[in-house]
């Protein structure tokens, strides 16, 4: 089973609402709809608002396509792994971006 580090990182960010993790991430580390989702997360931080919990995001129902993506692709057991350190995730995303 392959781990999608972008999805795993987004799940970790939504679950933990970690400012420390967010501060280490760049928009360029993500591609496709993952980049769109990270942009939504970034908009909360830019407005100095608290990042909503995963449950709150799912209740908003503003962007149905993005909501379905979060439910079906991000909030899955495959994208949950609390043994991988945040620093490792960031380093791997950074390495992928550089290449």
PLM features: what roles do these ranges have?
Residues 1-96:
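Noncatalytic partner-interaction/assembly domains of nucleic-acid and motor enzyme complexes
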């Amino acid at each position: 089973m392959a781990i999608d580090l972008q999805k795993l990182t987004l799940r970790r960010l939504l679950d933990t609402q970690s400012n420390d993790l967010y501060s280490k991430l760049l928009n360029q580390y993500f591609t496709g709809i993952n980049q769109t989702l990270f942009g939504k997360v970034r908009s909360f931080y830019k407005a100095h608002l608290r990042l909503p919990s995963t449950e709150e995001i799912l209740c908003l129902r503003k962007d149905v396509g993005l909501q379905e993506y979060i439910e079906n692709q991000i909030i899955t057991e495959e994208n949950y792994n609390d043994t991988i350190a945040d620093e490792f995730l960031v380093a791997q995303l950074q390495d992928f971006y550089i290449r």
